[in-house]
Amino acid sequence: MTTAKELQKNLTWEFPHIAKKNTAAKEAAFAYCEGYKEFLNTAKTEREFTAKAVEKLAAAGYVPFEEGKAYKPGDKVYFVNRGKSLAMSTFGTAPLEAGVRLNAAHIDSPRLDLKPNPVYENHEMAYFKTHYYGGIRKYQWVTVPLAMHGVIIKKNGELVKVCVGENAGDPVFCVTDLLPHLGAKQNERKLGEGIKGEELNIVIGSLPFVDESEEEGVKDAIKLNALALLNEMYGITEHDFMRAEIEFVPATKAQDVGLDRSLIGAYGQDDKVCAYTALTAEIDTKAPYYTTVTVLADKEEIGSYGNTGLNSDFVLHYLEDLAATQGANIRKLLRNTTALSSDVNGAYDPSFASVYEERNSCFVNKGPVLTKYTGARGKSGSNDASAETMAKVISIMDEADVFWQIGELGAVDEGDGGTVALYVAAMDMDVVDLGVPILCMHSPFELSSKLDVYYTYKAFAAFLESSK
């Protein structure tokens, strides 16, 4: 007769804490994450991530994709889309009409963007006007050291790269907030309006431009001094900001968090943690059965719109170009493809337990989270992966001894969220979300588990290498 304990063992399931099941995993995970932290520190924007990724790809033997060229199994290629997104592939032994293994992450993150006409002076202080990008909680972005990143196109067409606040000795920038002594009325605001969008103004200077040859000072001398310093550094004028993409991001570096150093704290881990693990898994794939397609896309945080986001056709066009190398039917390629939408999920936070449904939440240190659907209010705006797709991806991870878990994004009707999965599915592919659980998502300092990061890499590698 079967005992209750035997039945419990055979019929029930709980996702384990990785370190309790595999004590040897810590060393490999910690070593892998050193490279991840270093990459994060030098790739805070989508342009920087693309450039750094291309450096790693070139060092690993990847070459730019050429239309009309014949490729053989094991060949490695990449395609850069307008400097802000990219796709890369390792050719497999199976014909392209059998489908590809597609893994899509995004490399943009919430931030403060400059408005097209940003520079102004107010009561002898110089400021930048900003328009926030993505779903930020605005109150989190005040009194935080910020760095200036981006590009400016000068009148003569020259592209100037801008970066201030990242190197030792650089100045940083800041959005101010009220002192508590004068904050009584501000305290009456709802939390979402504690800081308003038009209050996210960045301090850039407080000293005037002084011309000793003139007896009377010029108008807006503080603003002029800031512009003069930028002109000295980069040769730009105020008019050039209209031809610019300037982003302000936290000036902090990726750091270990906790006495046991088990967590990583850094800006932009949504979704650069999945982008980095996808990139390294792609590079480490040598002889796949299916041709791999790893996509690092832009604009996910604002709906994937624009020609560098996955709501455009740039990935479809890349796949069409791949198909053309073998004269393959693109519809068969798409229909037979299995894909991952590699994006983070919100890890269970016991300090705010009421917004989660614990049984269907994801937790740190239990591995990458397989998210069947996102959306809200009846799964609206979701892909909702099929049982067959779930079974295939789970089987691949299980056969590779990958720790993983399932999870939703919060309790029903508590909120919403989306990924690129629905845009991948729109190309007639089977797709499911898989990514790292994150604490403090969309804040200037997000937290991830080193064990989760490492096993996400292992999950992606298993997915790309599997012949299932």
Predicted regions and their residues:
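N-terminal hydrophobic/helix-forming segments and targeting peptides
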Residues: 1-468
